[in-house]
Amino acid sequence: QVVAAVLLNCADATYVDEDGNWANVYGNRDVGIMAAKYDEFFHMYTDAQGIFREAPYFLAGVNSQSFLNFGVDPAGLEARVADTVYYQEIDGKEAMRVIYNPNIIHPWSHFSARATAAVIDFFTEALDAPNPIASSNQVWQWKEAFNFVGLVGFAIFVCAFGTMMLYTPTFESLRAAEVVQPAKVKDGKGKRWFWLSLIAGALFAMLIYRWILKTGTAMKVDQTEAMGLGLWSTLCGVFTILSMVIFYYCYGKKNGMDLAELGVKISLKKLGLSALLAAIVVVVSYGCIFVADYFFYADFRIWTLALKAFEAPILKYLPYGFLFVAYYVSNSVATNCFNYNNIGGKFNGIIVAVMAALPALVLPWIQYITYYSTGAMKWAGSAMHILWLFPIVLILFASTIMN
């Protein structure tokens, strides 16, 4: 047989045959399952009482027990446990079965020292490694650490290159004549407007997220993730614009707020130059990723957030990017013009950035605190949508700070 050993990473095995009977479809191959204890997508079943059980109960279920008993009906058999290798002779060959059950979530299995150790242990045992190395002897974390350094360096380059371009003759008209000082909020009403607008924006983003993601991902498009997140981004951008308009006419204008002085109101020429500068910064900055990929076969990433080189066919998906314009432009205006004030002192930017990222923090907190404490997800039907927020936390926070 071509395949000697199989380790299913956060995926279910085949437990029954075509007729629905318990079966050992793997024969005398060595087979294991990496079953994250809090997996959001696999290892679920309905128990004898008709109760739907999620991944934390996997080891107590009939599927796992049949698997560990080499495909027989587990009824009446002694319960088998995780992280223990079981052997049985099949067709003259000793085969093994094992389930690893680390206390992690699905995406963490691809970024976990425990999961990596289990993979090494499995194949060391299954393939009878002649000179085994301890499974704890892992160095991939260093690679990830330096990938993250590259990610930080990319962000620094974007800011530095964009700033440098403002000192060129073509774009110097976009640069402020002097260092812009934060606006002084002189009364309690102004402070209330500041905090309430930030809170309202965060609440709006949280409340519509699951609904708009379900709507967007149900559309018949090639990129459902981009569509769902893009629609969410657009609606949040529109809400931010409306918030700024309401603030301006209800408070700002009455208290001497000058849109031209703040840079909100600009000429068409400056608007065109701003768009051109943005395009140049994007092309040059992302060009660095292609250079790193070509010469060093490296990219910049940390866990679920990555900047990668891509091939030409991917360019057809570029129009999805326009769905994100409303949010990031309005966020830039809000951060630099409407919320840049003396509230919070030197931490003003951090406050605004935290509030921008708050929806992407709170929703996963609710999901996983519920999951870990009850054994059932808060929003099982939105499990993937909640996971998509993991990189967005860093994106929203960093983009606001970079603004």
List PLM regions with ranges.
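Soluble extramembrane regions of membrane proteins in the secretory/endomembrane system
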Residues: Q1-V139
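Conserved aromatic-histidine-acidic binding/catalytic patches
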Residues: P107, F111, V149, G153, ...
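A generic "functional-site adjacency" signal
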Residues: A113-T116, A155, L396
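Short secondary-structure junctions and interdomain/linker hinges
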Residues: A126-I133, V152-A155, C159, T168, ...
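Juxtamembrane/start-of-transmembrane alpha-helix segments at the extracytoplasmic/lumenal side
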Residues: N137-L151
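Juxtamembrane interface at the cytosolic side of transmembrane helices
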Residues: V152-I199
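Alpha-helical transmembrane segments of integral membrane proteins
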Residues: R192-N403
